[in-house]
């Protein structure tokens, strides 16, 4: 396959019993994951730290973001949800497929492998909207 480590995780059905984030706030954590290193290394560790023209954070030219690496391995890449990273970037370079609410994932599946960053509705305050039978008990093993 194109991504033997990711394929191995998927094939073996790994369940993560403990998960950790790279930062205590969402934008810094999301930025670190997509860059592949601690947000402190590139200055993106403060929540929404690259917002204005004067405060933009530019990554070094030799940095490749995870979706760019996936594209090089033959994947279609898309983002459905948050893409506010703590650095300046070219959205069209990072994601090569424009996803909309009517995109058929089966259609994507048969064209080529895809890497999608997907944020579902939810967040910190919306857990009361999830029906009880769909909630996951983190203590189950």
Q: Where are the regions that the model predicts?
A:
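Formylglycine-dependent sulfatase
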Residues: 1-141
